[in-house]
Structures are given as structure tokens and as C-alpha cells.
UniProtKB/Swiss-Prot annotation:
Protein name: Glycogen synthase kinase-3 beta
Protein's cellular compartments: Cytoplasm; Nucleus; Cell membrane
Function, in words: Plays a role in the organization of the formation of the main body axis of developing embryo. Acts as an inhibitor of differentiation of primary neurons. Inhibits the ability of ectopically expressed NEUROD1 and other bHLH factors to promote early retinal cell differentiation. May participate in the Wnt signaling pathway. May regulate the circadian clock via phosphorylation of the major clock components.
Entry GO MF terms: ATP binding; beta-catenin binding; protein serine/threonine kinase activity; tau-protein kinase activity
Catalyzed reaction equations: L-seryl-[tau protein] + ATP = O-phospho-L-seryl-[tau protein] + ADP + H(+); L-threonyl-[tau protein] + ATP = O-phospho-L-threonyl-[tau protein] + ADP + H(+)
Segments forming domain Protein kinase: 56-340
UniProt GO cellular component terms: axon; beta-catenin destruction complex; cytoplasm; cytosol; glutamatergic synapse; nucleus; plasma membrane
Record region (Disordered): 1-50, 384-420
Family: Belongs to the protein kinase superfamily. CMGC Ser/Thr protein kinase family. GSK-3 subfamily.
Length: 420
């Protein structure tokens, strides 16, 4: 979609990265059916760095790009499918994607199961292999299916997908991590369960106030206006803009801002939002305040979308696609928006008859930006269920292996006890 070069995912380090002693110890054999079986020494994605042998088979390429190659494989011990992302590792740097993924543990983020290093064909070539959850579909492919059939994506799916995206953003933003490449292709989907998982942290970065960042980031259609203006001191609200573009695309059946170039991208945005005011330009990048833009009026949001588009969807979109970065909703505020109220109905099920995926198991980490929203985000039926679950499992809450999720998933039960 964009011809941009792949941004680096390497973080500077004062000394070369030390590879594990087991580096490159990859054994290939054949099973009784003649299938290729690969055994590697890998490190778990979370927890202590205790290396272990991991054996997989049925390897096939499912994606590639400037970043490297993605394979699908089957773990021999469990039969589970995984995705293995193989990227060239620069020995001078730590891999930023790996550092970030090892911190993350959330139901709406693809899980790093293991990682291992392997050698390449050339001398001194080192590859990092990330073993990830395999999820069969993407929002991009599902939306394209409906678009080609000249049908609108059912609004219940728009709500489910966007809500889970905002949950994942609330979680990573609570750590100061900005994804920087939110787009439908990076939103993995299980079509049976409607579970969404955010993937591809190759452009992600922990943003630090006062430290500059590259502005040529994010795929063009989803690029926030401050990035087009060349800002280098942007915040994680660029992810919120991108999410707003995804929401608009799911409602429209096509990208809302389909620019042919960086400049044309801004033209497409101005066609909808109108010309930014001097103050809005200052908020995006102070260096552009004297630049003269043609004065164009904003297009009414109700005319941007189809006639039957729910007013709450339009209202949410208008709060995400704001020129001023600080005026955009936070991901947690977005989750609490009335557009998602239907998801809080205890009697609702998926169109295929299945139960909804987990939507209310908020962690204290997720809620940290605005804990007062828990009364909206965790509906009464979920609070009651959490309270019952906590009562019956009081002896199991100290499991030392639960990490971030286990130790913080009691936000709902804490909210229940506070409300009783």
C-alpha cells in the first residue's frame, strides 16, 4: 500500500548483542512420514530466560516483505500452529521488536511464544526468529471480502474489531509504547471466535518526551497529519488517528483518505476535515504555521458515510480523526464510547451463535490511564461474574507464573468489591 522503506526495529546498544551459547543449533530430521522436522533451542517469550528445545514441522512460507519472511509451522508437542517471523539481525544493535514483545501479555496482542537465532547463508549472517501465535485471518482480508461482494461489514463486527483494537492500544500505550503502523493488515482475526490480535511490532517504539522520532512512519493511508507535517515529537495519538482511519474504512468499505503520495494524503484529509486552523497546525508542527493552505470547508461527517451508518459510529470517528493530537480520544475513552454499548449487553451472542470473546477482563495496567472508566468498561454482569470467580479461586491467585495478566486481571473483581 505504501512504497516506504521498512523502518528499523533496532535499538542502539553500546556494545554488540551477545548471542546465546546455543546460537545456530538447529537440527533437521525426518519423521516416519518423511516430513521435515526442525528442532531448535529457543527462549520463552515471557518469563525467565530458560532455554528449551522446541520441535516443529509442516513449515511453509505465508508472507514476506522488506522485513524478512513469515512461516507457518506446527509444534510437534502440542500440534498447535504457530507463525515464525524471521528477520535479519544486526549484531550491533538490540532488536527493538523483540524487546517490546517480551514485555507484552494481552488477549488482543499476538503472543511471543519463543524466540531463537539462526545462521544465514552468508558468513556472519544472523537471523532472529520470533515464534508467534498463528491467527488465520486479517481485518484487511475480511473487509475486502465484503467489499468485493458489495456488502457492508455487519456493524456488530465493526464494533467487536474496533473495541478489541482500542483495548490493545490502551494496553501498549500504558507502557509508553507506540505501534506506529496500525492498519487492517496488522489486525489478525479468528473468524470463528471474532478474537482480534494486534501484530507486527517491527515499527513500534517506546516514545520518550523530548527525544525525536522519525516522521516517515506508518503506512500512508493511515498516517496522522502531524507525521505528514514532518513532526518528530509526536505522541502515541498517531495510533489513535490510524485506528480512526480503520474504523472509517470498515464503515465505508474503502479507505477514507486514499492519497497517492505524502502531499496528496494531506489533500485527501483536508477534503474531509477542511483546512486546519493556524492553531491546529501549531499543535501538529509549529514550523508550518506560516505555510499558506487553500481554504476549504469541512465536509459534514454525515455526508462522508452511508445513510444508514449509526450516528454513534460517526460521532466516534469524528473524535478520533482530529487535527489536534491532544483532542483525539484516548484508546480507553474510545472503549467507553456509546458506539460500543451493545457489546456490554449480557444477552448478545456472535452471529454464528458463539459467545462473545473476552471483552471485560481489563487489567489494572490497561485501566491505569483513567481508572474511573472501569464503571463503564466493566458492566455489572461482568463485575458479578468476576466476584464469583474470585471467591471460588482465592487459593490460586498467587501463581508465580501468571505475570502481568494474572496479577492484574483482577481489575473487574476489584471494581466489583468497590461497588458493593
Amino acid at each position: 500500500m505504501s512504497g516506504r522503506p521498512r523502518t528499523t526495529s533496532f535499538a542502539e546498544s553500546c556494545k554488540p548483542v551477545q548471542q546465546p551459547s546455543s546460537f545456530g543449533s538447529m537440527k533437521v530430521s525426518r519423521d516416519k512420514d518423511g516430513s521435515k522436522v526442525t528442532t531448535v533451542v529457543a527462549t520463552p517469550g515471557q518469563g525467565p530466560d530458560r532455554q528449551q528445545e522446541v520441535t516443529y514441522t509442516d513449515t511453509k512460507v505465508i508472507g514476506n516483505g522488506s522485513f524478512g519472511v513469515v512461516y507457518q509451522a506446527k509444534l510437534c508437542d502440542t500440534g498447535e500452529l504457530v507463525a515464525i517471523k524471521k528477520v535479519l539481525q544486526d549484531k550491533r544493535f538490540k532488536n527493538r521488536e523483540l524487546q517490546i514483545m517480551r514485555k507484552l501479555d494481552h488477549c488482543n496482542i499476538v503472543r511471543l511464544r519463543y524466540f531463537f537465532y539462526s545462521s544465514g547463508e552468508k558468513k556472519d549472517e544472523v537471523y532472529l526468529n520470533l515464534v508467534l501465535d498463528y491467527v488465520p485471518e486479517t481485518v484487511y482480508r475480511v473487509a475486502r471480502h465484503y467489499s468485493r461482494a458489495k456488502q457492508a461489514l455487519p456493524i456488530i463486527y465493526v464494533k467487536l474489531y474496533m473495541y478489541q483494537l482500542f483495548r490493545s492500544l490502551a494496553y501498549i500505550h500504558s507502557f509508553g509504547i507506540c505501534h506506529r503502523d496500525i492498519k487492517p493488515q496488522n489486525l489478525l482475526l479468528d473468524p470463528e471466535t471474532a478474537v482480534l490480535k494486534l501484530c507486527d511490532f517491527g515499527s513500534a517504539k517506546q516514545l520518550v518526551r523530548g527525544e525525536p522520532n522519525v516522521s516517515y512512519i506508518c503506512s500512508r493511508y493511515y498516517r496522522a497529519p502531524e507525521l505528514i507535517f514532518g513532526a518528530t515529537d509526536y505522541t502515541s495519538s498517531i495510533d489513535v488517528w490510524s485506528a480512526g482511519c480503520v474504523l472509517a474504512e470498515l464503515l465505508l468499505g474503502q479507505p477514507i483518505f486514499p492519497g497517492d503520495s505524502g502531499v496528496d494524503q494531506l489533500v485527501e484529509i483536508i477534503k474531509v476535515l477542511g483546512t486546519p486552523t493556524r492553531e491546529q497546525i501549531r499543535e501538529m508542527n509549529p514550523n508550518y504555521t506560516e505555510f499558506k493552505f487553500p481554504q476549504i470547508k469541512a465536509h459534514p461527517w454525515t455526508k462522508v458515510f452511508r445513510a444508514r451508518t449509526p450516528p454513534e459510529a460517526i460521532a466516534l470517528c469524528s473524535r478520533l480523526l482530529e487535527y489536534t493530537p491532544t483532542s483525539r480520544l484516548t484508546p480507553l475513552d474510545a472503549c467507553a464510547h456509546s458506539f460500543f454499548d451493545e457489546l456490554r449487553d449480557p444477552n448478545l451472542k456472535l452471529p454464528n451463535g458463539r459467545e462473545f470473546p473476552a471483552l471485560f477482563n481489563f487489567t489494572t495496567q490497561e485501566l491505569s490511564s483513567n481508572p474511573s472508566l472501569s464503571s463503564i468498561l466493566i458492566p455489572a454482569h461482568a463485575r458479578n461474574q468476576a466476584a464469583v470467580s474470585t471467591t471460588s479461586n482465592t487459593t490460586s491467585t498467587s501463581d508465580s507464573n501468571t505475570g502481568e495478566r494474572g496479577s492484574t486481571n483482577n481489575a473487574a473483581s476489584a471494581s466489583a468489591s468497590n461497588s458493593s
